[in-house]
A protein has these predicted regions:
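Alpha-helical transmembrane segments and immediately membrane-proximal extracytoplasmic
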Residues: 1-428
Length: 428
């Protein structure tokens, strides 16, 4: 009897010691991989940030270069045809996380160069989508080099996404959660939480140490939460949900029209560039070139935005991105949300500054279907003083924006409206 008891005790001790040893080794493995990924992707994203800052500064100092937008478009199409095969963009990264698809290593230098060309010549495009592709491509290649299995490669790609997002924006909390949340709406990849958070923090710290300034804005005139202010913010949030839907439809519609009328990619990008130039000349402003950071700052910090600024940013982004230029739609969605929210705030008699901040988070939520990320972005960029309004804006926008989204490979696993498994792709 005593012998059997001792034997069982030894078996239990062996089992638990082996289990603890396995868990510790797995923890150490992902700590090391996350730090390595954060450093490598952080370095690449820092260089990317400095490059975009340099080309944007050059464009502002030499406004004539905007007329070279058709030429840069031709170069971009040529590079992708000769080197990049078919570009899946951010969708390809999301597909890699969920399936056996790969992000080609060539995606990293291609998206770097072509996004810089787009910003140099004044296309209306963002940078975060490009950074996610950059980080995903580098991390995927790192996973191949060290012979990670399929499941671990999915996690390291998510680490790369988080690291790139964090390095550019300086928002490590939002960046870590974004990678977990964006692939499948309603399901969080918690197995990747620790490595994504570590990679995000390392990349953010690396970028900050190299001189990349984290994005932050000062929100003014934050009102007390009352029934009146809460209802007004609810109306702003509903408007933002509608705007996010219209933005997704505009992007998809522009892609459809370009594809229908201009089968040749070279002709398509030239026509798109000429349309962007024409609209810009008609508007007589260069504020809509690039990501729109100046419009965001003006809306949030000064409470000022032209009435139709959100509309024109939407139009020019759709014309630019769907013609074949590179960059991303995330920062333009920030700009659209901030300017729309600011206008709504002025119309409704509530602080345009807080409405711009809430609009930015709400439209981002509407186009990405990532409510937790959206709330964290608001916290990290605007501070915690307006927390009640951020929660109202993001939650209402998430529910009211339906199943639309920027990414066709994003899956809505569970319904937004009831505890129901739906497993469907987003509408574009």
């Amino acid at each position: 009897m005593g012998i059997d008891h001792n034997k069982r005790l030894k078996e239990h001790l062996y089992y638990y010691s082996a289990r603890i040893s396995r868990d510790i080794s797995n923890l150490i493995k992902w700590l090391v991989l996350a730090v390595i990924t954060g450093c490598i992707v952080g370095a690449a994203s820092t260089l990317f940030s400095f490059t975009l800052k340099a080309v944007t500064g050059y464009r502002k100092a030499h406004e004539w270069i905007f007329l070279l937008l058709p030429l840069s478009g031709l170069v971009i199409v040529f590079l992708y045809e000769k080197l990049g095969k078919e570009d899946g963009g951010t969708n390809q990264v999301l597909s890699t996380v969920r399936s056996r698809d790969d992000v080609p290593i060539l995606s990293a230098p291609l998206i770097f160069i072509t996004t810089a060309l787009t910003h140099l010549t004044g296309g209306s495009a963002g940078r975060e989508g490009a950074a996610i592709q950059l980080g995903g491509s580098i991390a995927n290649q790192l996973g191949r080099w060290i012979h990670l299995d399929e499941e671990d490669r999915h996690v390291i790609v998510m680490c790369g996404m988080s690291a790139a997002f964090s390095a550019l924006f300086g928002t490590p909390m939002a960046a870590a959660v974004f990678a977990l949340e964006v692939v499948s709406v309603g399901v969080m990849y918690y197995a990747a939480l620790m490595p994504c958070m570590i990679a995000s923090l390392v990349a953010s710290g690396f970028a900050a140490g190299m001189g990349v300034t984290p994005e932050s804005f000062h929100v003014t005139d934050i009102p007390a939460l009352t029934i009146e202010s809460g209802l007004k913010m609810g109306v702003v949030a509903l408007g933002c949900a509608v705007v996010s839907i219209v933005f997704c439809i505009a992007l998809n519609g522009a892609a459809g029209l370009y594809g229908k009328w201009f089968k040749n990619k070279y002709l398509r990008v030239v026509v798109g560039a000429c349309l962007v130039i024409a609209v810009t000349f008609i508007l007589r402003t260069n504020e809509y070139m690039g990501a729109g950071a100046e419009l965001i700052e003006k809306a949030v910090e000064d409470g000022q935005a032209d009435t139709f600024a959100f509309f024109w940013k939407m139009v020019l982004t759709a014309l630019t991105m769907r013609a074949g230029f590179r960059g991303g739609e995330i920062v333009p969605s920030f700009c659209i949300g901030a300017t729309f929210g600011c206008v709504m705030g002025n119309l409704m008699g509530i602080s345009p500054s807080i409405c711009a901040a809430c609009g930015m988070a709400a439209v981002f939520c509407g186009v990405t279907n990532c409510p937790i990320t959206s709330i964290l972005i608001a916290f990290e960029m605007f501070g915690f003083k307006g927390v009640s309004f951020y929660l109202i804006a993001v939650s209402i926008s998430y529910a009211a924006s339906g199943y639309y989204g920027l990414y066709k490979d994003q899956t809505i696993v569970y319904s937004k409206y009831k505890a129901k498994y739906v497993n469907r792709h987003t509408r574009l």
